[in-house]
């Protein structure tokens, strides 16, 4: 399974996200990496309420204050640091965490971490 280059660490500033594609179970999927309170996080871009993207394809995951991640379709609210849904139709469920590696100023995702 390949190692996927997401981008430069500098691209993921506080409250910003970068999307990337990966393969799971022979299906192309999308993930996103962001930074909240100085720490990186990465999740599968799939709402836990229904299997749809959290964003509208526009790479907008944070609310207007930059404090929570929001599903743009049904309004489910997730904590950026944990992925836990705190409000909405999937309260108590968590986004699927993706392991991202920061190495020499570059962000990587290793598909082998999915197994």
Give the positions of each predicted feature.
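N-terminal pre-ligand scaffold of iron-sulfur
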Residues: 1-65, 79-80, 94-115
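A short acidic, glycine-rich active-site loop
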Residues: 68
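Short proline/glycine-enriched turn/loop segments at secondary-structure junctions
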Residues: 87-90, 98
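Short cysteine clusters
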Residues: 47, 71-74
């Amino acid at each position: 399974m390949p190692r996927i280059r997401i981008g430069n660490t500098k691209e993921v500033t506080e409250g910003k996200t970068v999307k990337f594609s990966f393969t799971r179970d022979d299906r192309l999927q999308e993930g996103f990496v962001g930074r909240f309170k100085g720490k990186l996080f990465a999740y599968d871009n799939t709402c836990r309420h229904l299997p749809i993207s959290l964003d509208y394809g526009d790479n907008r995951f944070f609310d207007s204050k930059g404090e929570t991640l929001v599903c743009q379709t049904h309004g489910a609210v997730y904590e950026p640091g944990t992925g836990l849904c705190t409000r909405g139709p999937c309260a108590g469920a968590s986004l699927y965490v993706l392991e991202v590696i920061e190495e020499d100023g570059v962000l990587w995702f290793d598909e082998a971490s999915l197994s």
